Design a protein with these regions (language model features):
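Noncatalytic, beta-rich nucleic-acid-contacting surfaces in large DNA/RNA-processing enzymes
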Residues: 1-400
Length: 400
């Protein structure tokens, strides 16, 4: 598609509409797209099967692209009503011999009444029939073209906000989010890790034009808990994990939400290390559900039961930081993919001596390649003939 649009160099909306109708297996295999491009740029002459069809096909340089053009051609040449033209369109689509012969006879008779020679009418019918096999509904193509134009505009001139919106539309789809994060990297857009202090449910753009990770994309975190945290955060500041656990209703999230948040790195801003945040989950649950803590909060004296010298992290001082491998595995568990890095990147020097390409470097013209990847999933099915098919999902940190 990118190659075709570069070759076409569309200068008006109608050409984007035609481009989408042409980029389908039938037109591509028939070479219609090449003929359209060549005629647009004057490489091939623009010709019409009959002079009466110039008004019908001028927009597409004499190439029959749409089903509506087939119907209009029948109306202009053979005097078909719109109802008759639609019957012709459907007959051409079904390719039933008896119906086609019947429609051919009606078409030729109509053309002769319009002073078009029978032999010429037969040739025109065959030509229309040939193109009708690939004709696409213009209204559908125009709708897709408008969306394509709008999204291309937004992606070009408002890339951060556009990508944040697209990411937010895929909150529950890990594979899509990972692919979109890769696209952000390619575009030079920085996507920050989850942060309980600044992240919202959806992906948003901050004042530095960076994308804040959406908490709703973390596996196992309840939407009601995210909403509650964001509401509390607007009126209360969180100083550390213990402060957080006392100012919010832990029960709304429970163990599952806290584990996912800590493993994804969302608590890094409130904890000395991610390993401590992960180890603190049970104590946060216990401390947050303490009724006395809630009463302290209501009375406005949050630390009434604590000595000012109390260090909540004292018991965790001997916990070692996570290794990169451990951190990545926790991210994989909570986010569905590796965010901070990738296991393949850790052995980059060895990998580069073995593989011929990274996934991001693969193109359709590469017939053979050696890759170093991690297999994410394997799915086996049987086709209609009962033959086994295997689908393997894998990635190397540059693509999936």
């Amino acid at each position: 598609m990118r190659d075709l649009i570069k070759r076409l160099k569309p200068t008006k909306f109608e050409e984007i509409t035609a481009l989408l109708a042409l980029y389908r297996p039938g037109p591509l295999n028939s070479g219609m797209h090449d003929e359209f491009v060549d005629r647009k740029h004057g490489i091939s002459p623009v010709t019409y099967p009959h002079e009466l069809l110039e008004q019908v096909l001028e927009e597409t340089y004499g190439v029959i692209v749409y089903q509506e053009q087939v119907m209009e051609a029948a109306r202009v040449l053979a005097g078909f009503s719109l109802g008759q033209a639609d019957i012709l369109r459907r007959a051409m689509g079904k390719k039933k011999k008896e119906e086609m012969e019947e429609q051919r006879e009606i078409f030729v008779q109509g053309c002769t009444k319009n002073n078009i020679k029978e032999n010429n009418a037969e040739q025109i019918f065959d030509l229309i029939n040939q193109f009708a096999e690939y004709g696409f509904n213009k209204s559908h193509s125009a709708a897709y073209a408008l969306i394509s134009y709008q999204t291309a505009f937004l992606k070009t001139y408002y890339p951060e906000h556009f990508m944040a919106s697209v990411l937010s539309s895929e909150l529950g789809n890990t594979d899509k989010i990972y692919a979109l994060i890769q696209e952000c990297n390619r575009m030079g857009i920085k996507v920050l890790k989850p942060n309980i202090i600044s992240s919202n449910k959806r992906f948003i753009v901050n004042k530095d034009n960076e994308i804040e990770y959406g908490l709703g994309a973390i596996k196992g975190v309840a939407d009601s808990f995210i909403k509650h945290v964001c509401e509390k955060r607007n009126i209360l500041k969180f100083k550390d994990l213990w402060d957080f656990s006392k100012k919010i209703d832990i029960k709304l999230g429970g163990k599952k939400s806290l584990e996912a948040l800590s493993q994804s790195g969302a608590f890094d801003s409130l904890s000395p290390s991610r390993s401590i945040a992960i180890a603190s989950v049970q104590d946060m649950l216990k401390d947050g559900s303490n009724k006395n803590s809630i009463s302290n909060l209501k009375s406005g004296d949050l630390f009434a039961d604590f000595d000012e010298t109390f260090d909540p992290y004292e018991k965790y001082k001997n916990i070692q930081d996570l290794t990169l491998s451990e951190q990545l595995e926790f991210e994989k568990k909570s986010l569905g993919y590796y965010l901070s890095g990738h296991p393949v990147a850790a052995i980059k020097n060895k990998v580069n001596r073995i593989r011929s390409h990274s996934i991001s470097e693969l193109t359709n013209d590469i017939k053979k390649s050696s890759l170093i990847c991690l297999i994410n999933s394997v799915r086996q099915i049987k086709d209609r003939k009962g033959k086994p098919l295997t689908f393997i999902n894998f990635d190397d940190g540059t693509g999936i």
